[in-house]
Amino acid sequence: LLSSGRKFAGSDFGFRCRRRTVIAAVAALVLLPSEAGAAGWLSDIFKGPSKQGKSPAHVASRKPATSAKRAAAPKPHAVRLAALGPANLNFLKPAASMCDPSKFRIVLDVGHTAESEGATSARNVPEFTFNLRLAQRIEEKLKAEGFAETRLLLTEGKARPSLAKRVAAANHLGANLFLSIHHDSVPNSLLEDWEFEGKKGHFSDRFSGYSVFVSRNNPDFKTSLLFAELIGKAMKAQGLQYAQQYTQAIMGRYQHPLLNKETGVYGYDQLVVLRSTRMPAVLLEAGSIINRDEELKMDSPERRDITGNAVAAAAKEFCGPQEAFLGPL
């Protein structure tokens, strides 16, 4: 795909293609807010127990083997929407022709917001805290590998309006890759009750593992899939296993097709942040925080380092000779 883009770059055909791409991109940005607003059921991946949902089955309280106190969310240091600079249109160029790490911009989207925190872990820590810590570590790893243009993206407000803000910010920043950072939960029907440090909570030890999502409606799906597979490959190389529950009927409306059984890449075609960004986009669920054992791992600096190393390795391979691994796609 990227080789074909270079082949026609100097021709009249290439000019017409770029002109149509620019027009389509501008139209997409204008239509974005109404589109995102209409997608009300999309609050990213499902997150946490619903106040309206059925009460989970009760399980006798038990003391965890290892305790972990709720930690305050780290102080944000990120790109704010109000501070965005002039738009960069480099995202319209083929990725292979501009994959110089020092100039290649990866936007790390911190899933959820301080006002709408996403899932709640088994020990009652908000997902947003996990997302921010991990995104900050990934940013450090990427910059250490020479990806100096990496940007951390924080949005504010409620979940649904923030979807449009994320897409608009990524498009405005001229990102070459968009990676949204999340931590996983399960549907309400799979949750059980327990107590931790005298407080009621919910857990499900049934599933664990990371998962990677892409949208086949993204304007550059093939490159999205490529980067997602590289992340999955790198996570697997670190000894991690992907979550396999998304293909099961028990997941209900959260069921998704598995696109690569080797790397744990799933399709999530209608997710706004994956389909409406104008650059390749991937969502990483780093692990399950509703699983009591995995939550402890996700809360450790060691696990954040492992995940950060995997993402950095994927980015380095992505910026290597593209023709070497585009074939299987």
Locate the predicted segments by residue.
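N-terminal secretory signal peptides that target proteins for export/translocation
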Residues: L1-C17
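Catalytic-site microenvironment of enzymes
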Residues: D12-V26, L32-L329
